[in-house]
Design a protein with these regions (language model features):
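A glycine/proline-hinged amphipathic helix-loop "lid/cap" segment
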Residues: 1-41, 46
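Short beta-to-alpha linker loops that shape the active-site pocket of alpha/beta-hydrolase fold enzymes
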Residues: 39, 62, 91-95
Length: 135
């Protein structure tokens, strides 16, 4: 409903510079994620671009029941540009459709994947940022 402007909350602004990816999760579930990279980095040409200084995993707010990985594009793009870091927002599963602890498991699985694979991808060390649930 929020994406259609049918709630008191305005529809999110989705920026064209974000890249949608999925990360593996336990079982057969794939975690939808969205990332912003500093303008000095392009994954397609890693050899000639400047590697990110690190990676921020963004855990969006919403009390495990609202919002998604595309809800804060403007803020995440700002973080990427100001810090020189890659910023990945995790689209964890939401209650009540997917009751607790499914959302928490998605966040844990995304973090584990980024810790185990981020350096190999040239993304640097992992830190966490977020609002409400992500604090």
């Amino acid at each position: 409903m929020r994406w259609n402007g049918e709630t008191a909350l305005p529809a999110p602004i989705v920026l064209p510079g974000g890249t949608n990816i999925t990360l593996p999760s336990r079982g057969s579930h794939e975690i939808p994620c969205r990332y912003f990279a500093p303008k000095t980095y392009t994954p397609e040409s890693q050899a000639t671009s400047i590697a990110p200084k690190g990676t921020f995993m963004h855990i969006h707010g919403g009390g495990w029941v609202l919002f998604d990985e595309k809800s804060t594009d403007t803020l995440l793009n700002f973080y990427a540009e100001q810090t020189g870091c890659l910023v990945i927002s995790v689209g964890y599963r939401l209650a009540p459709e997917d009751p607790w602890p499914k959302g928490v498991e998605d966040v844990e699985d995304a973090a584990q994947y980024l810790v185990e694979n981020g350096r190999d991808k040239g993304w640097g060390d992992l830190s966490y940022i977020g609002g409400e649930v992500g604090d």
